[in-house]
């Protein structure tokens, strides 16, 4: 059973995506912000993290992704966001870009259809990202 950490402040989307992932056989832990995400990871390391780009402020999701990639380089990350938010933050981040500035296996524009998210999670897990 794959353990997925779903990090997003939108409770409605979290509920929909969690239900779809659980129905697909995944064990899902949720967090609404970076503090909750870090606490959840401290309790149990997930097999994959799905996170919103814009947590707790302009770049908190990006910062969390970079931090997780540094400490857990084999942990697959899928990032969700509204396209305009990602582009704006990516432009700001480009000022100090390096090869690991966006260490995610997949960007997905919100709202993501639950079945599409399930497919991407399954694909990332099977690919061994």
Regions from the PLM with identified roles:
Residues 8-9, 110:
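Acidic di-acidic motifs
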Residues 11-29:
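Two-component/phosphorelay signaling modules centered on CheY-like receiver
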Residues 33, 59-63:
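Acidic catalytic/metal-coordinating carboxylates
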Residues 36-38:
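Short alpha-helical segment
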Residues 42-44, 67-74, 99:
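Conserved phosphotransfer cores of two-component systems
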Residues 44-51, 55:
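Active-site beta3 strand of CheY-like receiver
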Residues 63, 83-109, 115, 119:
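Alpha4 helix (beta4-alpha4-beta5 surface) of REC/receiver domains from two-component response regulators
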Residues 112, 122-129:
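The C-terminal output helix
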């Amino acid at each position: 059973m794959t353990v997925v950490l779903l990090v997003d402040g939108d409770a409605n989307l979290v509920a929909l995506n969690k239900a779809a992932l659980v129905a697909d056989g995944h064990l899902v832990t949720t967090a609404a912000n970076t503090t909750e995400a870090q606490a959840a990871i401290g309790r149990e390391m997930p097999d994959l993290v799905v996170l919103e780009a814009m947590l707790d402020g302009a770049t908190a999701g990006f910062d969390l992704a970079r931090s997780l990639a540094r400490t857990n380089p084999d942990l697959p990350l899928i990032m969700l966001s509204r396209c305009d938010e990602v582009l704006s933050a990516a432009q700001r981040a480009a000022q100090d870009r390096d090869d690991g500035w966006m260490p995610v296996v997949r960007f997905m524009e919100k709202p993501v259809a639950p079945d599409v998210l399930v497919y991407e999670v399954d694909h990332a897990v099977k690919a061994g990202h």
